[in-house]
């Protein structure tokens, strides 16, 4: 099933997304859930944490997966995806270390891709992937190009991505990222795409044509049979 839902504002989008996440967790307490980071899913995660505490949901068997990470930044720096997930998911939920499958960020090479991919496979694959639409149409750090890599890989960051809000605190240029590939994302049993935020109208319009193109990596989600998109633009 492919569902496209227009939502009136960011708050409503985040509320609905958190309910969706909670439903997945309730139906499969040992779910493996891949999480994007950044401004788009921030309020969704806040609401999710709130609901889990209020409703005393058992999360002891859950596993979260970090979708991507900047390369060459120490993991503990403010702008990393790791710091984001630690602050907004891991610490508020009191997760054990083994409940987050996570890319390291320094001295990265392709063996890091193998390590993370193998850990996901051992858990039985992704049940849900939560994604945001990038200003240039990227998914994770799968950047637009003439061709896209299906598997987990180290990517060269698009010029627009190098100006990402999260990197404003980096204090140095960041030109590479490590990310799950499009095949990894499309292999998830369900995909939830959140489309919100300023400067994304062009990417949103191109995505909504439903024409699959390597120039808009997010367009590959139209190939997924169990895909929900919440839009507020």
Q: What kind of feature is each model-predicted range?
A:
Residues 57-67, 75, 125, 139, ...:
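Active-site histidine-anchored catalytic micro-motif
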Residues 47-58, 81, 144-154, 210-212:
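A glycine- and small-aliphatic-rich helix-loop capping segment at beta-alpha/alpha-beta transitions
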Residues 35-40, 131-135, 196:
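Glycine-rich beta-strand-to-loop/alpha-helix junction loops that act as flexible
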Residues 1, 57-130:
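Ligand-binding beta-strand-loop-alpha-helix segment within the catalytic cores
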Residues 1-33:
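N-terminal glycine-/serine-/threonine-rich phosphate-binding loop
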Residues 136, 140-182:
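Class I SAM-dependent methyltransferase SAM-binding "motif I" and its flanking Rossmann-like core
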Residues 183, 187-233:
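ATP/nucleoside-binding phosphotransfer catalytic cores, i.e., glycine-rich phosphate-binding loops
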Residues 27-53:
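Glycine-rich N-terminal segment of FAD-binding domains in flavoprotein oxidoreductases
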């Amino acid at each position: 099933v492919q569902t496209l839902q227009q939502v009136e504002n960011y708050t409503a989008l985040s509320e609905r997304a958190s309910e969706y996440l909670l439903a997945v967790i309730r139906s499969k307490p040992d779910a493996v859930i891949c999480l994007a980071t950044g401004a788009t899913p921030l309020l969704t995660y806040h609401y999710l944490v709130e609901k889990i505490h209020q409703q005393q949901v058992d999360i002891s068997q859950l596993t979260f997966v970090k979708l991507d990470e900047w390369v060459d930044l120490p993991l503990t720096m403010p702008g990393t995806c790791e710091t984001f997930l630690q602050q907004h998911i891991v610490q508020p939920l009191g997760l054990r270390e083994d409940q987050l499958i996570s890319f390291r960020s320094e001295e990265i090479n392709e063996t890091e891709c193998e390590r993370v991919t193998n850990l996901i496979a051992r858990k039985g694959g992704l049940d849900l992937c939560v994604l945001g639409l990038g200003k240039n149409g990227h998914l994770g750090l799968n950047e637009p190009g003439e061709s896209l890599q299906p598997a987990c890989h180290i990517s060269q960051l698009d010029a627009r991505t190098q100006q990402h809000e999260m990197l404003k605190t980096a204090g140095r240029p960041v030109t590479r990222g490590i990310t799950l590939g499009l095949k990894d994302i499309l292999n998830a049993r369900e995909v939830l795409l959140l489309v919100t935020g300023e400067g994304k109208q062009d990417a949103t319009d191109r995505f909504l044509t439903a024409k699959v193109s390597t120039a808009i990596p997010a367009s590959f989600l139209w190939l997924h049979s169990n895909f929900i998109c919440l839009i507020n633009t």
